[in-house]
């Protein structure tokens, strides 16, 4: 059996640990596969993007109106962000990622969707801690969003960092709601099914 090799496109030490972006060719599928690893854990793969795309599709489908301002928490491979841009109602897309290294991958156009993101004037990539942003009091002149789409942690209980825990509480979600327009939508990607009420 032939071994499938990979090319490491980037490797960085971050406050969250070692992060790497890898590319490999899958001979069985005939496609280039992009993967992100944090320490020894696979975070994402371009082979499995349906859930990230559906986060944007379903989240925006729940929003009425036009000229939508959208915030995406977590950039990663860019699948959620690019899917949001496909909705013609999106006026602006702000994508927040805590790791400048991840934003840098797109600025260096290392990923297949990087050109789509960067060449669209509606897109703004921001290096910031999404969870800290969600906790902040909203200044009077700060923007509100019609939709906030979050794909950062694996699940509300399997988090990339322990400091994210308070976001997944009633108080954390109330704080986030300050950043939404009235009637706005918050959508969350999780690797687990919804919990029983």
Language-model region placement:
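The AdoMet/dcAdoMet-binding core of the Class I SAM-like
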Residues: 49-189, 193-196
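N-terminal auxiliary segments of SAM/dcSAM-dependent transferases
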Residues: 1-34
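Short, basic/glycine-rich phosphate-binding loops at helix/coil junctions
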Residues: 30-39, 153-155
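Short, surface-exposed beta-strand-loop junctions and turns on beta-sheet-rich folds
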Residues: 27-28, 42-43, 140
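Class I SAM-dependent methyltransferase Rossmann-like catalytic core
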Residues: 17-19, 23-24, 36-67
